[in-house]
């Protein structure tokens, strides 16, 4: 008698009819957890980081390799994007100034710095970069947009392709001596702040729309 994955009998199969007999334990799941699944996103790519002192500067190198998927990251809706954040602080918790390297673009979220904007998910202007497929609506010129059903034009696309590696470097000014703590985070965001804020969607990291994909801390003496 045929049995299912839980060992229970399958009684609706006619002998010799209805297809090829297979061991249920060998049939892979066809579930699609999607972009709300933390475990899926946190096993999508490999991040490697290094930090070293060069005179009065701290040089941070970040490598991201899309080695665990067969498609671009992020994929599906053009609303989705990734934010790479690179922080360097002294022993007093003061942020070191970025002297060379990329910063998160405006659509990473512009907030009120007096209210600790970065802690609320407004990352525009911070050391790091973003990965996204940017579209512009041809009639309204709204960009970035996720309304791909409207007439749109491709502005840029720097998403991480399958098996591709992105390497970026960031140089921070620092005292010639003294400990420096470097923190690197890769955040998956499911919608732009310009859309999420008016709708009241939750954005805080670890919430419904922001998922922490990778994180690493380094200490430079």
Regions found by a protein language model. Give the residues of each.
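Primarily the internal scaffold of c-type cytochrome electron-transfer domains
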Residues: 1-161, 168-174, 185-221
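Exposed beta-strand face motif in extracellular beta-rich ectodomains
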Residues: 178-182
């Amino acid at each position: 008698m045929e049995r299912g994955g839980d060992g229970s009998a399958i009684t609706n199969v006619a002998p010799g009819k209805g297809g090829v007999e297979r061991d249920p334990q060998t049939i892979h799941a066809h579930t699609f957890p999607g972009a709300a699944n933390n475990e899926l996103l946190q096993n999508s790519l490999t991040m490697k980081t290094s930090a070293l002192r060069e005179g009065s500067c701290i040089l941070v190198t970040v490598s991201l390799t899309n080695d665990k998927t067969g498609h671009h990251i992020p994929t599906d809706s053009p609303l989705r994007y990734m934010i790479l954040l690179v922080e360097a602080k002294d022993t007093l918790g003061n942020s070191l100034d970025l002297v060379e390297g990329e910063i998160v673009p405006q659509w990473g979220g512009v907030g009120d710095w007096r209210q600790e904007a970065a802690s609320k998910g407004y990352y525009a202007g911070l050391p790091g970069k973003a990965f996204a497929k940017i579209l512009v609506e041809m009639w309204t010129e709204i960009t970035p947009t996720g309304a791909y059903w409207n007439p749109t034009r491709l502005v840029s696309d720097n998403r991480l392709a399958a098996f591709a590696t992105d390497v970026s470097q960031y140089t921070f000014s620092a005292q010639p001596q003294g400990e420096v703590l470097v923190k690197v985070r890769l955040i998956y965001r499911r919608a732009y702040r310009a859309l999420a804020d008016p709708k009241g969607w939750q954005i805080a990291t670890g919430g419904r729309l922001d998922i922490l994909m990778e994180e690493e801390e380094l200490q430079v003496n």
